[in-house]
A protein has these predicted regions:
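Short beta-strand scaffold segments in enzyme catalytic cores
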Residues: 29-31
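Beta-lactam-recognizing serine transpeptidase/beta-lactamase-like catalytic domain environment
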Residues: 7, 33-83, 88-179
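Conserved, well-ordered alpha-helix/loop/beta-strand core segments that scaffold catalytic motifs
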Residues: 1-27
Length: 179
């Protein structure tokens, strides 16, 4: 079968350089074309350099192979979706008729759910949908998610392919975890 490379050189370089300059030296960056799913950039740090093995065997240098990061964070890491999931929550609420984009929800900087308190990154005061998205207001989306319900959100997240492998055909790709 044929393999077509869709990487954008400038985006790929920017992703790799950005990861090199990060304080932790660890992370992943992926840029996709939303229309086609083509991978425009895919980087993981620390990077894996197979050239380090040239001329060595494990018997020659057993410590060397343990130092190499053979884990591609971009395709093998499993992460909480964080703010990217707010749009999924909004889509589920719109689909089920639970979202009035003009309705204002007050953000006091936290959301109480039973005995648990979830914090927002700021105190936004009254926000509508557009403010909730542009300010990434956690409280707004906690309220919308609570009103929409887990079943509706799960239906939409599956439509958006959450919990599945992408099919990128790279070794070790992991499916997301919905729970």
């Amino acid at each position: 079968s044929d393999v077509y490379l869709t990487l954008n050189f400038d985006l790929q370089r920017a992703a790799e350089e950005g990861l090199k300059k990060s304080k932790t030296g660890r992370g992943a960056a992926v840029a996709l074309d939303p229309r086609t799913g083509a991978v425009l950039a895919l980087a993981s740090a620390p990077a894996y350099d197979p050239n380090i093995f040239v001329g060595y065997s494990d018997e020659d240098n057993p410590k060397q192979s343990k130092k190499i990061n053979e884990y591609n964070l971009a395709v093998q890491g499993i992460y909480p979706p964080a703010s990217t999931f707010k749009i999924i929550t909004a889509a589920a609420a719109l689909e089920d008729g639970h979202l009035d984009v003009k309705r204002k929800i007050n953000c006091p900087g936290h959301y109480n759910s039973g005995p648990r308190v979830f914090k927002c990154w700021s105190t936004h005061g009254p926000v509508d949908f557009f403010d909730g998205v542009s300010n990434s207001c956690d409280v707004y989306f906690y309220v919308v998610a609570s009103e929409t319900g887990a079943a509706a959100i799960e239906r939409v997240e599956r439509k958006f392919m959450f919990g599945r492998q992408t099919g990128i055909d790279l070794p070790g790709e992991k499916a997301g975890n919905l729970y």
